[in-house]
């Protein structure tokens, strides 16, 4: 509460915004009571007490919205509708944000950090669950958000998964029979639009950050601060995600898949080093990105990585280079340019390349592979590979992918990482360097077979 700039007298904490003229009062006596500012509509007292941890998340969410400039009269808590038995929450949404005309603009479902948030988001991805039920009740809603906040290591951390319910014309035109948000009239059709047309795309920032403007919700450009170092608990999740993607798309060539994964690692490392202020390694969703732009960005990063780290020149011409070349021919009609670009796209994308998890030799297979590629990129885009200090978990992650991706046959067996660590720690490397110099050590074979030669 002190971090949120509440002042307190005994058990009563108060936040006053003298500029906008509103007050939030939290009384910790007894079961606790939260008094929201005048103008905020409170339909039920369920979230206005301190008996549940989720209520603290709702409190912090409302505080943050007000702090960013949303007016109290545009915020409504716990609007309620008759809900089927499979919808949790009793048919009550946590926070509804209305626009200046009083229409529903944003629906927010607050969850506690960790398991509850993850479980409910999984349900959302399965059938739409609470969020899509609420959205059908308020069809003017433009955005849905699942939100959590937590106090961790003396710092307030926030997590949000945001879904846009606004249609994208270009995306709809790419389907023969598109399913749109606009024409959806029930939960299943609204979810089908998100699931099929927009590939369940969600983004993680655009509402609660310091730079956000009320009612201007859009994914902000990603920078190095948006990604985090991997921890022990994340490793198994990434293994499972990797194998799930391969299984879902019937990718049988594990060794090829691992090769392409290594290429993605290389592209991501280059991105973090060269584009830390504006990362390029991410999937921006079908409403803002497309498969061609994504692969073009990845190829440019991969080309730079091969040249910088491996000294290998990779032939690749990106889209912007072609655009610039055409500017030299001012008298050429646009039709000629479009035709040549079409042929160029076929040659560049509709063949096997450095990110082909499956064989690609036509447009249909390009799109099929692109679906795999997008999921692989999403798996890695929030992981920080370039760290200031060695990250053992990152090494363990790569080792796990290696074990899973490369068939171990005679002469190819990989020694488990703990054994390798033990072997290296027992080598008298420091004494050897002191007595014979650094140039003496040429190579160290970290496998059980080579160990017999050291002995």
Regions found by a protein language model. Give the residues of each.
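Charged, often low-complexity linker/regulatory segments
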Residues: 1-66, 169, 204-243
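Conserved S-adenosyl-L-methionine
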Residues: 415-455
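Non-catalytic accessory regions of SAM-dependent methyltransferases
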Residues: 198-279, 283
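Nucleic-acid nuclease catalytic cores
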Residues: 118-174, 180
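Active-site metal-binding core of divalent-cation-utilizing nuclease and nuclease-like domains
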Residues: 12-22, 46-50, 73-102
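Active-site beta-strand-loop-beta-strand hairpin of nuclease catalytic cores
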Residues: 31-37, 96-108
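Short beta-strand-loop-alpha-helix junction that forms the active-site gateway
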Residues: 101, 110-121
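Long recognition/docking surfaces used for binding and targeting
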Residues: 266, 273-403
